[in-house]
Amino acid sequence: MIKKYQGRKNEKSTLKTKNKEEKKMTVLQKTGLAYYDAHYPHHNRPLWMNFLKLVRKMKPDVFVFGGDNMNMDAVDHWINDHKKVRQMEGKRVLAEYEGFKKEMLNPLEKALPKGCRKIWLDGNHEAWMELAIDKNPNGEGYWEVENNLHLKERGWETYKYGEYAKVGKILFIHGQYTNQGHAKKTVNVYEKNVVYGHDHAPQLFTKITPVENEPHTGMSLPCGCEMNPHFMRNRPHAWVNGFLVFYFTKKIFSLFPVTSIFDGKFIAPSGKRY
C-alpha cells in the first residue's frame, strides 16, 4: 500500500500552531510609556506635544509619570531659604497646579486609552510641598498634590517619593542618587530591575548574580524639561531630553529609551518620526 504524501498537511498544521503561539504571545505582551522629570512649567513644550502624538498612536497599556512632573516653583526651598524674594515674584501654588492640569495632565488623560494603567510617582520636587507645609501648617489640606490634582479620583495609582511601582519584572522609582555611577548604585541597593529618573540623563548598568545567573538592570532615563532653566545659569551639564518606550510580559521585558536632541523631535522605536 502506498501512503499518501502528508507533507503539505503537516506544514499547514505546524503553521497553525505557530500562528496560535504568536497570537498568544501578542495577547500576553503589553506596551508602556514612561515620562520623567517634566518640571512643569519648565517642561520642553515641543517634546511634550510630539509625545502626546505618540501616546495616541501607541495606545499604551501602562503609563508612568515618573516624578518631578511639577517643579513646585512656589515652594522652592532653595530660593526661599536663601531669601531670594525677587525670584519668587508671581509664583503661586494654585496657579501651578491649574496650569499643569491644563497643559499636561488633561491632554495626557485624553490621549491615553481606556483601561490604561496610570502610575504617578512623586519626585523630590513634589516632596517639597510637604516640606513647605511643615514650615507653614496653615497650608495643610490646601497645598497637597492629591488635594489639587485629585489623582486617585481620576484613576491614577499614586506613590510617594521613595516608594516604587511594579510593572512586570520592572520597578519604577523616581531616583535618588546623583553620583557618577548612579545606575550601578541603584542596582546594588535594590537588587532588582529598576527604571528611574532624577538625573536627567540616560545611564545603564547590569549585574549578573551568581544565583541562577539572574540579571538585574538599572536604567536612568532622559528628562522632559528645558535644558537651561534659570537656576542652571548656563552651567554645563549632561542632561538629555527624552522618555521611555517599553514592552513587557510577566517574565520578560525590553526597554527602549528615546532621546530628543533637536527641538523636541524624535524617532520612535517603530521608525516613525515625530
Indicate residue ranges for each PLM-predicted region.
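N-terminal active-site segment of His-dependent metallophosphoesterases
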Residues: 2-105, 273-274
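Active-site metal-binding loops of divalent metal-dependent hydrolases
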Residues: 36-39, 67-70, 124-126, 175-177, ...
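Conserved beta-sheet core of the metallophosphoesterase superfamily
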Residues: 169-263, 271
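Active-site neighborhood of divalent metal-dependent phosphoester bond hydrolases
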Residues: 75-161
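Core dinuclear metal-dependent hydrolase active-site scaffold
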Residues: 15-27, 32, 162-187
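A short acidic (Asp/Glu
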Residues: 44-45, 73-77, 129-134, 183-184, ...
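Hydrophobic/aromatic residues located in beta-strands of well-ordered beta-sheets
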Residues: 63, 118-120, 218
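C-terminal/domain-terminus segments
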Residues: 21, 26-28, 120, 253-274
